[in-house]
């Protein structure tokens, strides 16, 4: 009997005719009249060479969703925000008054640095405040984390050398970020979740409404693992992620929102860590992605690194010191490189001054140099060359030429680099459209999609595509594609296979993502086994393998034995993403952190309020002086001293209780002032109202009214 562990194999040969229904999407080519390849399940360590007989693929069913009937999720009467979770900066937007609006953060800025830090006192900092202290705390400041999300350690060997914190791998080969300040190792999803949490908190304050649902954007060329990891980050942050959409697609939504004319646009998205190109048809509320291409290892960080390496190599040649081994110096070099890159977008040269970058026995050392725009472009020439290929690929996949493009939309801060803009002009022969803010357009587009899902926006249909092909491992280490790239989402396809060996009772399905021909060059995003197949001659069992991709671009795969009805399925989460129980733990920790943050904020607010009460009380005691009766003054001073002690060392609740007690005593001051006899009022009846002094208005004189108490407004003429 064959081994129970098996995989899919493929052979050439004559086989059964294939029945196939054509897709409504023009990107698909099912070739219904061609003779199918022979595909069957066989042993992983099969001793066979070429079997003389084998069953072929028995049929193909394409259940691709109709192009214009994608039903949106409806969320009634709840604010849904759009979030651009960027490598270097993030932004959040929402629909306000029928238009997408950027949310300003607590610091008053429209974008938030994607930076998280932990201090020696174990305080957590997020955003601009975290970025500002990076130089003095490089090992505990996490930035460019998006480059590690959903990735395995062997995929990010080069990126891990470019950051000042320590990137390590866990027992499963997944990426972890070491934080010595609190003695913990974070998954990239956890750090991203903290950035998301700040964005959502800022949005809640801005909108004056609790936000729990969001649309999050990802680079178009993110694979399945990275998309699922991004969704996990949202869940850890306490969000329900309604949709994951591609960044260029989001940018097209912002650009094409309220535009009625039909246009073919090319979105050129060069951000901090990734590069994407998408070609879309836009018009009459329909946004159809024709093709997408990109490079997840190319972005503004790489341009910064070229400048850092240049500075470090020049310094090493002059001084013999390698600054790249000094984490604090590396962080200063990185910040200086970013600043110089930004300045060279508007200047032809910039001065770079880094005093006291290091020190030797001869004294402190400094960097003082000038970087010209020409030198910068020379340092980054190979990066600029890498931009060409994805642009050409996207047009070829869309079966278009540059003359067919009506508009070129620039997205991402790195598109402000003059050399990048010049390259776009040369490639496309068109002047780039600069009507949208490259830092904000993705978040604005995500807000439009959020509006569609919440019902705030109607008459918009978004037809996105899968960026990478999906398939199975077959004989000889070859990848057989089931869903080709640029297939419109959501989609569903199935194929029927058979076994390769007599008596085979189990098959193993290895799911792959990528464009290369061989398994070793593509990414394995999951595998599972279908057991319990009745022993039968090879080619007899019929095993249907079905691929489903939802609107988020996340894949589910199922395999069923048509003879027994036995079924096995899996939602592909990728080998590098977090197990469900680990995500659940992180969600609980995030909730605990949120509670702790709320308690810390409450403690700070309470202390500030108590300090104000102390100041006002002392001021009142000083102004009223001897007018306050001795016993009342003693009680107030006692409570005042107690409150000062509680502010210094008490709990938040103790401060609140003491503050309330002090306020009660302070109220007695006013009561005692009105109850005590006034000068000239010695004949007033006990417990009665004190009569006015002789120089007050005659209407206030009540001494001759037989002791009657008269209610009246009291006016101090002084």
UniProtKB/Swiss-Prot annotation:
The keyword Disulfide bond does not apply. Transmembrane segments: none annotated. CDD domains: ASKHA_NBD_HSP70_DnaK-like. Residues 668-718 are annotated as: Disordered. GO terms for cellular component: apoplast; chloroplast; chloroplast envelope; chloroplast stroma; plastid; plastid stroma; thylakoid. Residues 1-92 form a transit peptide. PROSITE patterns: HSP70_1, HSP70_2, HSP70_3. Residues 668-678 have a biased composition (Polar residues). Keywords: ATP-binding, Chaperone, Chloroplast, Nucleotide-binding, Plastid, Protein transport, Stress response, Transit peptide, Transport. One of its GO terms (biological process) is protein transport. GO terms for molecular function: ATP binding; ATP-dependent protein folding chaperone; unfolded protein binding. It holds the Pfam family HSP70. Induction: By heat shock. Disruption phenotype: Defective in protein import into chloroplasts during early developmental stages. Belongs to the heat shock protein 70 (TC 1.A.33) family. DnaK subfamily. Acts redundantly with HSP70-6 in the thermotolerance of germinating seeds. Plays an important role in the protein precursor import into chloroplasts. In cooperation with other chaperones, Hsp70s are key components that facilitate folding of de novo synthesized proteins, assist translocation of precursor proteins into organelles, and are responsible for degradation of damaged protein under stress conditions. PANTHER family: HEAT SHOCK PROTEIN 70KDA. HAMAP family: DnaK. NCBIfam families: PRK00290.1 (NF001413), prok_dnaK (TIGR02350). This is Heat shock 70 kDa protein 7, chloroplastic. The gene is HSP70-7.
């Amino acid at each position: 009997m064959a081994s129970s562990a098996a995989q899919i194999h493929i052979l050439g040969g004559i086989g059964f005719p294939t029945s196939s229904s054509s897709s409504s999407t023009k990107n698909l080519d099912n070739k219904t009249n061609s003779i199918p390849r022979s595909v069957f399940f066989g042993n992983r360590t099969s001793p066979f060479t070429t079997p003389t007989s084998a069953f072929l693929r028995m049929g193909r069913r394409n259940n691709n969703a109709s192009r214009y009937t994608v039903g949106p999720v409806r969320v009634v009467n709840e604010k849904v925000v759009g979030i651009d979770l960027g490598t270097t900066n993030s932004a959040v937007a929402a629909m306000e008054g029928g238009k997408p609006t950027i949310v300003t953060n607590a610091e008053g800025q429209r974008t938030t640095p994607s930076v998280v830090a932990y201090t020696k006192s174990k305080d957590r900092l997020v955003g601009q405040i975290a970025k500002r202290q990076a130089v003095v705390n490089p090992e505990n400041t996490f930035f460019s984390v998006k480059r590690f999300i959903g990735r395995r350690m062997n995929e990010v060997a080069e990126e891990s050398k470019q950051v000042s914190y320590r990137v390590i791998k866990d027992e499963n080969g997944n990426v972890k970020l070491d934080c010595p300040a609190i003695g913990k190792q974070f998954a990239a999803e956890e750090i991203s979740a903290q950035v998301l949490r700040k964005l959502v908190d800022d949005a809640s304050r801005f909108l004056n409404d609790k936000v729990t649902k969001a649309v999050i954007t990802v680079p178009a060329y993110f694979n399945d693992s990275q998309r699922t990891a991004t969704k996990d980050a949202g869940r850890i942050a306490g969000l329900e992620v309604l949709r994951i959409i591609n960044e260029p697609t989001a940018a097209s939504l912002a650009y094409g929102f309220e535009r009625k004319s039909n246009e073919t646009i090319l979105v050129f998205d060069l951000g901090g860590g990734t590069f994407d190109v998408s070609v879309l048809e836009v018009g009459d509320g329909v946004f159809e992605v024709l093709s997408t291409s990109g490079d997840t290892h190319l972005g503004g960080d790489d341009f910064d690194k070229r400048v850092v390496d240049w500075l470090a190599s020049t310094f090493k040649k002059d001084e013999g010191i390698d600054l790249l081994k000094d984490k604090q110096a590396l962080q200063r070099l990185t910040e200086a490189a970013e600043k110089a890159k930004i300045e060279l977008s508007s200047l032809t040269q910039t001065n770079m001054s880094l005093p006291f970058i290091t020190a030797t026995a001869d004294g402190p050392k400094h960097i003082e140099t000038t970087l010209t725009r020409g030198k910068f472009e020379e340092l980054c020439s190979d990066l600029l060359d890498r931009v060409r290929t994805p642009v050409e690929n996207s047009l070829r996949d869309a079966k278009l030429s540059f003359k067919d493009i009506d508009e070129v939309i620039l997205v991402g801060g790195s598109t402000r680099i003059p050399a990048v803009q010049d390259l776009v002009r040369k490639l496309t022969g068109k002047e780039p459209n600069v009507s949208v803010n490259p830092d904000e357009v993705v978040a604005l587009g995500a807000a439009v999609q959020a509006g569609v899902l919440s019902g705030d926006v109607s008459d918009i249909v978004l037809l996105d595509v899968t960026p990478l092909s999906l398939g199975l491992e077959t004989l000889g280490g070859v990848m057989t594609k089931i869903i080709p790239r640029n297939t419109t989402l959501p989609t569903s396809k199935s194929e029927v296979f058979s076994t390769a060996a007599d008596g085979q009772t189990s098959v193993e399905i290895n799911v792959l993502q990528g464009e290369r021909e061989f398994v070793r060059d593509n990414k394995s995003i999951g595998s599972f086994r279908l057991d319990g197949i009745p022993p039968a001659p090879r080619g007899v069992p019929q095993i249907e393998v079905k691929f489903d991709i939802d609107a988020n671009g996340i894949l589910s795969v199922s395999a069923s034995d048509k003879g027994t009805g036995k079924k096995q399925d899996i939602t592909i989460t990728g080998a590098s993403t977090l197990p469900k129980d680990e995500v659940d733990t992180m969600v609980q920790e995030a909730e605990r952190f949120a509670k702790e943050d709320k308690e810390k904020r409450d403690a700070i607010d309470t202390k500030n309020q108590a300090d104000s009460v102390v100041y006002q009380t002392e001021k009142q005691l000083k102004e009223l002086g001897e007018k306050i009766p001795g016993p009342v003054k003693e009680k107030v001073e006692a409570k005042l001293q107690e409150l000062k002690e509680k502010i210094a060392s008490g709990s938040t609740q103790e401060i609140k209780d003491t503050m309330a007690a002090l306020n009660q005593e302070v109220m007695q001051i006013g009561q005692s002032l009105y109850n005590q006899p006034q000068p000239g009022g010695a004949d007033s009846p006990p417990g009665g109202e004190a009569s006015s002094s002789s120089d007050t208005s005659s209407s206030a004189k009540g001494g001759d009214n037989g002791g009657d108490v008269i209610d009246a407004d009291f006016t101090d003429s002084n």
